[in-house]
């Protein structure tokens, strides 16, 4: 019924066709139907399926893991280390087609209040932002900084607002993204990434720095900005993919008692929880 196009799709389709260490025999996008953000309705069931029925509206967790490695047991097939790991639309057929063959263990029931388009967003982009919000432990007492206002960054601000964050600050290279965030009502203060002295500006605005900084840019400068703009004892969550970052371990991290957390997509449990939280 619906299948989204992710930023990672654009990156790999146009810039990087390759196999992964987890699936060296299955190069990305080679010989497979694309679409790793699928959401639809079950029209037929295979033998042995017990948890769903024909007619159910479901979203598909976009990685099918082995089901037995420690990460799969934790509910994170995205980090599967076993044999047979394959992403829908990357190493097995995905959602950009009339029908999709999915495994029952990868399905999540779509709440009645949500559309198929909502489900497609949750199956990757919103779920990724949601996990970052959880890892950062965002609450109503927090000043939250989001660096990189693409789809995931926008969703992170939306979710932070939904959790009652005290103040939400956005940073991006593009003024039109800042304007959109302001128009949507998910951002209290916005700055261009080229603004001089941003860490000091954010420190003054928040009386000490962001309690939680979420980098959704995947950019070295963005990651450094997120770290340096975080308050003492604050949490920095790196969500954006690829790239590198360099910083002074003592001056930028240890002496400020800051904590860096890596967050990659989300778990099956949290994706289901995200869907219900959005109703």
Regions found by a protein language model. Give the residues of each.
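Glycine-rich beta-strand-centered segment in the early N-terminal region that forms part
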Residues: 1-4, 18-70, 106, 111-113
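Generic hydrophobic/aromatic pocket-lining and core-packing "Φ" positions
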Residues: 9, 157, 178, 223-227, ...
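Phosphate-binding beta-alpha-beta segment of Rossmann-like dinucleotide-binding domains, i.e.
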Residues: 62-97, 118
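Mid-domain Rossmann-like dinucleotide-binding core that forms the NAD(H)/NADP(H) cofactor-binding site
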Residues: 105, 112-195, 200
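Glycine-centered, small-residue-biased loops immediately flanking beta-strands
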Residues: 142, 234-235
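C-terminal substrate-binding/catalytic core of Rossmann-like NAD(P)-dependent dehydrogenases/reductases
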Residues: 199-203, 207, 242-279
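Short SAM/SAH-binding signature in class I
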Residues: 208-214
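Helix-to-beta-strand junctions that scaffold the AdoMet/dcAdoMet cofactor pocket
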Residues: 230-231
């Amino acid at each position: 019924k619906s299948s989204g196009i992710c930023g990672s799709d654009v990156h790999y389709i146009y810039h990087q066709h390759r196999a992964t260490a987890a699936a060296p025999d299955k190069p990305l996008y080679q010989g497979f139907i694309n679409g790793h953000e699928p959401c639809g309705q079950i029209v037929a069931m295979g033998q042995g399926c017990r948890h769903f029925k024909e007619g159910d509206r479901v979203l598909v967790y976009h990685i099918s893991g082995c089901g037995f490695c420690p990460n799969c047991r934790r509910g994170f097939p995205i980090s599967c280390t076993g044999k047979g790991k394959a992403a829908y639309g990357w190493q097995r057929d995905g959602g950009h087609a009339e029908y999709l063959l999915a495994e029952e263990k990868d399905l999540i029931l779509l709440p009645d209040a949500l559309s198929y388009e909502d489900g497609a967003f949750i199956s990757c982009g919103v779920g990724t932002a949601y996990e970052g919000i959880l890892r950062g432990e965002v609450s109503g007492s927090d000043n939250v900084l989001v660096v990189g206002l693409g789809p995931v960054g926008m969703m992170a601000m939306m979710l932070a607002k939904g959790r009652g964050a005290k103040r939400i600050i956005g940073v991006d290279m593009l003024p039109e993204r800042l304007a959109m965030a302001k128009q949507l009502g998910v951002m209290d203060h916005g700055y261009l990434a080229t603004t001089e002295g941003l860490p000091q500006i954010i420190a003054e605005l928040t009386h000490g720095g962001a309690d939680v900084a979420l980098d959704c840019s995947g950019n070295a400068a963005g990651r450094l900005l997120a770290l340096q703009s975080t308050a003492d004892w604050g949490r920095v969550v790196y969500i954006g993919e690829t790239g590198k970052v360099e910083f002074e371990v003592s001056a930028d991290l240890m002496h400020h008692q800051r904590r860096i957390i890596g967050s990659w997509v989300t778990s099956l449990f949290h994706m289901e929880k995200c869907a219900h939280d959005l109703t």
